[in-house]
Amino acid sequence: MPDQIQIEVVYALPMRQTTLTLKINTGSSVEDAIRESGILARHPEIDLAVNKVGLFGRAVALSTRLERPTRIEIYRPLLADPKEIRRQRAEKAKLQSLK
């Protein structure tokens, strides 16, 4: 039997966070771990073709192999373009400073 590692799969919403802990075989992919965790059944809005994933805040591919205990994070899509928001804030601040 292959060695197993303990991992967490985390998905955060604005008002709550789901954290699932499980043991998987060493060398399993991030995608395998997510599917095995059952989080997709709890959160049907997660689409692995759309949602980005990461390990401790660093984006990784679904095919990344897991060799040590870790935390897999599933990220929600951005609601707005960060560059556009910064541009709008700068424009608003400029207008307010002219008053």
From Swiss-Prot:
Which Pfam family name is an example for this entry?
Ub-RnfH
Q: Which InterPro entries match?
A: Mopterin_synth/thiamin_S_b, RnfH, RnfH_sf
Q: Which domain of life is it from?
A: Bacteria
Signal sequence region: none
Kindly give the PANTHER family that the UniProt entry links to this protein. Answer: UPF0125 PROTEIN RATB
Q: Which HAMAP family match?
A: UPF0125_RnfH
Q: Which family does it belong to?
A: Belongs to the UPF0125 (RnfH) family.
* UniProt name for this protein: Protein RnfH
Biological source species:
Tolumonas auensis (strain DSM 9187 / NBRC 110442 / TA 4)
At the highest ranks, the source species' classification is: Bacteria, Pseudomonadati, Pseudomonadota, Gammaproteobacteria, Aeromonadales
